[in-house]
Amino acid sequence: MLKNDLFLKALKGETVQRPPVWMMRQAGRYLPEFIELRDKYDFFTRCQTPELAAEITVQPIRRIAPDAAILFSDILVVPQAMGIEVLMKENIGPFIPNPIRSMADVQRVYVPDIQESLGYVMDAIKLTKEMLNDEVPLIGFAGSPWTIFCYAVEGRGSKSFDMAKGFCFSNPVAAHTLLQKITDTTILYLKEKVKAGVDAVQIFDSWGGMLSPVDYQEFSWKYINQIVEALADLTPVIVFGKGCWFALGEMGKSRASALGVDWTCSARNARYLSGGNITLQGNFDPSRLLSPIPTIKKMVHEMIDEFGKDKYVVNLGHGILPNIPVDHAKAFIDAVKEYGQ
């Protein structure tokens, strides 16, 4: 039995004393103990070594004590498993030496055997669950098919992802074939994560906001919703679309347990657009953690007042930044725990 199930209660829409809190990228570069391991091991070694991934996952639980842990991994382990080479380059970030630019390229990409290619993730989950000792729930995650597609076609991060969008518009059959392969792989991957022991999953649609509302339905939401439908009976599913406020209405009608919101959408608008019945997660501007601690606490309390304490998970509107002082991150978590006291 979980000692702290506040997060799962909020996902079910149950009444709570206070909302739960965790932070995207909470196992990250703002923690000195994370930096120590980063300096010793390269990025994918940390992802692919269960002992390292588990240790990194529990670091923030010890240090700042959020109400949920999120497995340390990366969305790009999925395309790696599908036969796409992915490197992590200094000062560039994700880099794909042979991006996908044709139907022939798409046909070389395959839906893998998950245990064979991503078994190390399942081992990390089992190890993390042991280390957490039922203190808090564990979240597993995956990138949205569109977000994975963006990297696979563009070959690296981009301000506009015009190659990826251009591929959709000029070669829609190939684009949809690739998106479906990514979707099928992601469903199998998340199902294995649930079997391995995660308590909830989150889909990160980091680049969904690059698309117009019409294109979003065709190239992103259609595929995310397949994942939601496939997982909803097995585990709570959170969908986080950065910059996707325009899709909250459609998302709110889905079987997702919660929707993540970024800081460009007010609590009032998010509640209104999503239909008012679904749990929302967010949406503190990560840069605001650079504010003085009393300001952070005041703003967090105001944010909870705006969203309401029920059907709400306190989080940032995107991942925590590397330059945030640890005591500021802790103040964010503490502010939620002090709410209403």
Curated annotation (Swiss-Prot):
Main localisation: cytoplasm
Gene Ontology terms: cellular component: cytosol
Enzyme class: lyase
Keywords: Cytoplasm, Decarboxylase, Lyase, Porphyrin biosynthesis
Chemical reaction(s) catalysed: uroporphyrinogen III + 4 H(+) = coproporphyrinogen III + 4 CO2
Record localization: Cytoplasm
Entries under InterPro entries matching the protein: UROD/MetE-like_sf, Uroporphyrinogen_deCO2ase_HemE, Uroporphyrinogen_deCOase
Keyword Cytoplasm: yes
Function: Catalyzes the decarboxylation of four acetate groups of uroporphyrinogen-III to yield coproporphyrinogen-III.
Assembly information from the UniProt record: Homodimer.
Name this protein carries in UniProt: Uroporphyrinogen decarboxylase
